[in-house]
A protein has these predicted regions:
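N-terminal cationic and glycine-rich segments that engage phosphates or anionic surfaces
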Residues: 1-103, 108-447
């Protein structure tokens, strides 16, 4: 009853209600677009494409696009080109002074960085769209499925549509972030992944019930393990280290009384401050080697065959070793960007606060940096372990690969991380309007 009361309160806040409706509408548009097949392709003859993209690297890529990749949809490229562009721009920000300057200019600089990211996204789409179209026959689409043939008109129009589809998906994500609830790009990926969950479970269930020796028991064991992994993922996302902060008591003149302190408060430093972005970034990079190795000009060479063998098997040893290392690296990198310890120290000093035993200002900033480094290491390792856990599930329990992706890994971590982030935003609206949050009673707390 408390949850129902809280959900009722959500609809009492006009701004929050409008944001939720807009978000749901945008997500529905994205899911609808994922079912719209490119003009000139017979949708009834795409069965082989779906079969060939159920497992391995292509299966994961298809999950990221919510099935659009296997549908030869107008959204077949998904939002991954935008993520790739974001990675490139942020990495270039380390070495290029102009981008470093923009990063320090606040909102105005961020607008310029966003514009650069958009243009780079278009450039990446212009490369990926022809590659996707050329690969369709090798992925199982028969020649008769191309109703107008594979001439220049088909390629030109399809490239324009695929690039436009990616730009439109990028626009949807940005609008959700600005006018809706949650991080739009992450939500688009999450709903795509969720769309593949029922099919994956049904396939695993069908495979298990045909076993004569305890198939249903194995399903129950898998579900228990799944819930445990979800719980571990939630704990990782929610875990914080509290740093005690003391505030000097204000005087009537607006200053601070010397050696007279108010109540003690805390700065919550998250164990995984970077959220799901390291997973998304690392996964975007892991798509590259296998796809390059499978291209026509590479697939017959020794290098191409090695890349395909090592990086197309997402449950293989080397794939997961590199994946885990990238997650750890990106966790440190993204934490450094998203946790501005200098600004935190300055804000603390201006408000009359300090960490007991630590001088305000530079010393406080260095102390917070030290603490973040200490907690980021175990946090990044834990994140990497959960990310590669599906490989262990496949090897130890012979789980269907599509279903195994939800036992930790990119899919589950994105779902959990994005869901919690979105709930926290809703929670903040409720608390600002003097209602208890989603995890509390849902009562109006106005005095």
């Amino acid at each position: 009853m408390k949850l129902i009361e809280t959900l009722k309160n959500v609809w009492k806040i006009t701004e929050l209600k409008d944001r939720i409706i807009l978000t749901l509408g945008m997500l529905l548009v994205y899911r609808f677009g994922a079912q719209v097949v490119l003009p000139g392709i017979d949708a009834s003859k795409l069965g082989a494409l779906g079969d060939n993209t159920e497992q391995g690297l292509l299966g994961l890529l298809n999950a990221f696009t919510g099935g659009a990749f296997a549908n030869a949809s107008v959204f077949a490229l998904g939002i991954m080109p935008y993520i790739s562009a974001s990675i490139v721009v942020q990495l270039m920000g380390i070495a290029i002074p102009y981008l470093q300057k923009l990063q320090k200019e606040g909102a105005s600089g961020q607008k310029k960085i966003t514009q650069i990211t958009r243009w780079l996204t278009i450039a990446i789409c212009m490369v990926q769209a022809p590659g996707y179209l050329v690969s369709l026959p090798s992925l199982g689409i028969p020649q008769e499925a191309f109703l107008l043939g594979q001439g220049g008109l088909f390629y030109f129009s399809s490239i324009v549509i695929l690039v436009t589809g990616c730009i439109f998906a990028m626009w949807l994500g940005e609008k959700i972030t600005d006018k809706g609830i949650g991080n739009g790009i992450s939500l688009l990926i999450m709903v795509g992944i969720i769309a593949t969950l029922p099919v994956s479970f049904v396939q695993e269930y069908a495979a298990r019930v045909t076993e004569s020796n305890g198939g249903l028991i194995m399903i129950l064991i898998e579900l228990v393990i799944w819930f445990v992994i979800i719980l571990a993922s939630v704990m990782l996302v929610m875990a914080v280290r509290k740093i005690a902060v003391q505030y000097a008591r204000r005087t009537a003149s607006g200053g601070y009384e010397k050696n007279v302190f108010g109540s003690r408060q805390y700065i919550p430093l998250k164990l995984n401050a970077s959220g799901v972005m390291p997973i998304i970034f690392a996964q975007a990079i892991m798509f590259v080697p296998g796809l390059i190795g499978g291209m026509d000009f590479m697939k017959d060479s020794n290098v191409g065959q090695w890349l395909q063998a090592q990086f197309s098997d997402i449950f293989g040893l080397w794939y997961n070793v590199v994946f885990a290392l990238l997650i750890i690296i990106f966790t440190y990198f993204y934490t450094a960007i998203t946790v501005p310890t200098n600004k935190m120290a300055d804000d603390l000093k201006r408000s009359g606060g300090f960490i007991p035993g630590i001088r305000p200002g530079t010393e406080t900033s260095e102390y917070l940096d030290k603490i973040m480094s200490q907690i980021t290491l175990p946090g990044s390792i834990f994140l990497a372990l959960i990310a590669v856990f599906p490989a262990f599930i496949v090897k130890l329990m012979n789980v269907q690969q599509g279903w195994a992706l939800f036992f930790g890994g990119t899919s589950l971590l994105i779902m959990v991380g994005v869901a919690i982030d979105t709930m926290q935003q809703v929670n903040s609206y409720l608390l600002n309007k003097h209602y208890d949050g989603l995890m509390k009673t849902g009562k109006n707390r106005k005095g």
